[in-house]
Amino acid sequence: MTYFMLFLGLCFVLGGLAVASNPSPYYGVVGLVLASVVGCGWLMSLGMSFVSLVLFMVYLGGMLVVFVYSVSLAADPFPEAWGDWRVVGYGVSFIVVLAAGAVVGGLVGCWDSGVITVDSVGMLSVRLDFSGVAMFYSCGVGMFLVAGWGLLLTLFVVLELVRGLSCGAIRAV
């Protein structure tokens, strides 16, 4: 199980690396899907199946729509691939930064904490991921409002960017 968790962590880092060093939006979608599937699988293997399912639906439902808009806006006739030297240089530099962060984190002593999986204190009648979702709705009302306004603003920005020269969704009244 330890090797499987390490493999999922490595795949998650590689998916994030693919999103960060994407040469064109076409390949960024592949990295995002890889990172979201592996991250949700990681959460599911830790015992948080509900949160994993919710995040999977949000990532694949919401973020892929954003990438569809960016692909339609940045349609290149000759997109750069991951094999180009510039993109390989980005990837190597990101890996060097991650390795340096791991070394510094190990020297400082940031790796002493463990992972709390399903139960926080022994056998409980409520799983940790369900109580966490309840805490989102009880204590996180302000953050939900800020996130909702941010998503509404993002929707209007995307609609303005996509409309081009024609009369789009937002018109002067």
Swiss-Prot record:
TM spans, by residue?
Answer: 1-21, 27-47, 48-68, 87-107, 139-159
Disulfide bonds listed in the record? none
Give the way it sits in the membrane: Multi-pass membrane protein
Q: Which reaction does it catalyse?
A: a ubiquinone + NADH + 5 H(+)(in) = a ubiquinol + NAD(+) + 4 H(+)(out)
EC number(s)? 7.1.1.2
- Provide this UniProt record's keywords sorted from A to Z: Electron transport, Membrane, Mitochondrion, NAD, Respiratory chain, Translocase, Transmembrane, Transmembrane helix, Transport, Ubiquinone
| Function (record text) | Core subunit of the mitochondrial membrane respiratory chain NADH dehydrogenase (Complex I) that is believed to belong to the minimal assembly required for catalysis. Complex I functions in the transfer of electrons from NADH to the respiratory chain. The immediate electron acceptor for the enzyme is believed to be ubiquinone.
Into which family does the record put it?
A: Belongs to the complex I subunit 6 family.
Provide the protein name: NADH-ubiquinone oxidoreductase chain 6
Organism the protein comes from: Synthliboramphus antiquus (Ancient murrelet)
